[in-house]
Amino acid sequence: MANNTTSALHPRGSGQRCVYDTVLRFGDPDARRRGFQLDEVSHNKLCDIFDSGPLHFAFGDLKVMKVAGGVVTPHKTVVKTVYVSGVQEGNDYVTFAFTPGPNEWREVDPRIDKRTALVGVLVQEHKKLDSDLKESRRELSQLKLEHSLLRHDYERLVREKPGPAMRTFKFSAVIFYAFFLGFLLMSAVKGEVYGRCLDSELNLNGNPEVCLHWEEVKSFSLQVALADFWNMTLDYYATVAPQSPLMDLALGYFPYFANWHMAAFLVGTAHVVAAERPLYMLVTLVLATLSRFQLVALAAVPMLDMPSSIGLWVTMVLFAIDQAFAILASVLISVLLLILCLAMNDVDYGALLRGCVTLVSATVFSHLVSFLHAPGWFTIIAILIYRIPKVLSYVSAERVDIKGPDGKIKETQNANPSWITKMSGLKNFFQRAFRQKVRTGVNPTTRIIPNSLVVIDAKDGRGTGFRVRNYLVTAGHVVGADTTVRVRWADVTSFAHVVYRVPNKDIVLLTLPAEYNSLHSYKLAKEVVDGTVVVVSNGDGGALSVGISEGVIVGESMTYAINTADGMSGSPLTTTDGRLIGVHQQNTGFTGGAVIFRDTDFPQPKKPQREADLEAKVAELEKALAAYTQSATGEDIVGLVRVAIQREMEVLRKELSNEFGQAKGKTKHKRRIMAAARSGGKRKPGKVWTEEEYKKLLEEGFTRDQLREMAEAAREADDDFDDYEEEKNEVDYPVWSDHDSDEEIDRDWFGQNLPTWSSAWSDFEPELDPDVTKTLPCHLEDKFSLKHYIITEADLKHFGQEMKEYMDHLDAVIKTHTEKGKWCPNTNTEEILKDLNAMWFKLNHTMWKNGVAPFMQRKKQKPKNGKRAPKGAQ
């Protein structure tokens, strides 16, 4: 029999049992044994139906058509057969029953067995992952082989690669460069001498016909004056300075640095050697030499765009012919360019306007230089006077941000290039070695969930989505009016339908495709508060883009400053621990905003009308029943009696107080003090924070000792406030309340006689607080100030001087040693608190000694706003 149960189940058609089915053996053992026996005579085998996974065997009834004498009758016969259930490939749960007659397994309505379904799905998933793993390994092996071959080819090509070849120059560039050099030499050897004629024979116009005798003069008086000053300076230096051949050589060649021909030669040669298209600069240098623009043209080049550069070329050609007409032509060309280029955007049009102004200014300045015969150094000084103030702001800056027309920063350049340090690889060495930063706070860590975002493709654009519960959430403007959008997660693409649009919010909920069941689901934040927020979106190349900023709540939105990008709409806005706050919406290039997503924004299930009517009826009946059962139980009656007795006792005590002027009796606060004395002065402290608040404070950076001090200070503030709340309703007599024990009743009614006045007054003698070192700086005024007590004229008459000295000392301590509710650095807090406590005790003891109730025995006045200081304040 054992041999008959080894029929094929895994792999398909192999004749081997699946190991999971062999071990688990779900179902009826007898049905399992009978099923394998029937499988031997069946035309289709179980191994062909179920490729893997456990099977569930069970007996069941099956209705088959009755066949008599080869004729099918309309009556059905119920036979007992075997049902086999399992999970097929594709995670489909099916059930097959053995049908006698045809002797085959036929599919019937599934009979669900949870264990078989769960294990079967896991087996199918394991099989799929195992297949994917094998395929990935094959691909990895193939890629490694291809990489090895490519590496071999690369090494071979590197060995065969020739060395760096000398750069080849274009023939046109070489010819034009030679022409440029010849033009420079021709212009340099041109001799022009200015002089004054000495002949006395004049023609009819008053000018000499032929000048045989003349003397050289210089038309620029400033040049003569500066030359004389320079020569005098050199002569004086030569007489007092030590002789240096290098100094003489430098001073001899210094004038050549202000020569145009030398500057043009250096600039032209540099462009021919290094520039890809040197002809543009060579043309500019030739025209500048021809027209005598010279250094003015070279200084104007950085501020010219393409239209104004062409205008400069035309103007220089005209300047060589007629300077006055060239000035007029520069103005006309500038006006024409400004009119023809009105269709440009603001940025390009601004650059054109700057180029036109530079063109006209360069033409006018060149005319003045030519008219005055100014030397080259004069032009250089004038250009430096213009350029240096313009770039002073750039020189003092550490970096320069280059922005585009949309306001976004396109590029950031370092204003301190430090080329030698950069090329030496020593960047920021000394800063890293010697600069130490002081930690000013604790930066929170951020929890980022990888592979948790999907890409939403709609007709109106593209955005980001994420999963919350069994929905995909994104921004409403991403989906637009579409009802179906395409969703892409990693390499899986599917379609999702719009399920719900949140009213008054730009949020849309989509269906979750079956392929995305393993997508991580975000959890909602427990509370939405101002603080650090995190925006996670899909970046370029499939990487995650994470932005961290400080968020501020504005209504049902949260705004924050972050550098957003296109396609971020619909991204999740989370807390630092990954809890969802809202859905990212806005994109202005710098600021961002999100709509807060709450639990109430999910679609609420609609209740059937019958259920709603029943709930309303039940509520109505409960309301009516409450009226009938009012004060029907013994507890209710006892409560009513207690309230009535309490009311009568209050009236009686008020009457006794008004009639006899009896002083205050024992208050609840006094009773609590007496109880504490009987119990040894120990009082079990109550909890100030919940466990969740305590952990949150620890995460924010507070130590356990600091939290302990904060808790004790908060308990002291609670005790003071409770005393005020208990005493504020007393009218010359304490409010009646039940006694806590029989011992307290015996002590109040049958105790010892009342003490004498002297012994009673001695009981109220102030005591020095032994430990005040735990008092926080923000509680100094509340603990030691006299502003919270009622001070009578008699108090001022007898103790005014002591009170003034005490308050002046307290104000001086608060102003000198505290700042914004915190101790100032290097402050000896223990000595200050002991000093204040000693002065407080001295003042109260003086009042008690003179028969006046000290402030320790008086109650504080309630603050105007009726609120206490927050717990745990520092």
Swiss-Prot record:
List residues modified as O-(5'-phospho-RNA)-tyrosine: Y694
Name any GO cellular component annotation: membrane
What molecular functions are annotated in GO for this chain?
Answer: 5'-3' RNA polymerase activity; serine-type peptidase activity
Location of region: Disordered:
855-874
- Keyword Transmembrane among UniProt keywords: yes
TM spans (from-to): 249-269, 279-299, 324-344, 365-385
Enzyme class, first EC level, given as a word: hydrolase
On modification after translation, the UniProt record reads:
Cleaved by the viral and host proteases. The protease is probably autocatalytically cleaved.
Catalytic residues (UniProt): H477, D506, S569
Note the site residues: Cleavage: G195, R196, Q436, K437, Q662, A663, G665, K666, Q752, N753
Q: What is its EC number?
A: 3.4.21.-
Q: Which UniProt keyword terms apply here?
A: Covalent protein-RNA linkage, Host membrane, Hydrolase, Membrane, Phosphoprotein, Protease, Serine protease, Transmembrane, Transmembrane helix, Viral RNA replication
Could you tell me what reaction this enzyme catalyses?
RNA(n) + a ribonucleoside 5'-triphosphate = RNA(n+1) + diphosphate
GO biological process assignments: proteolysis; viral translational frameshifting
**Family affiliation:** Belongs to the astroviridae polyprotein 1A family.
Q: What is the protein named?
A: Non-structural polyprotein 1A
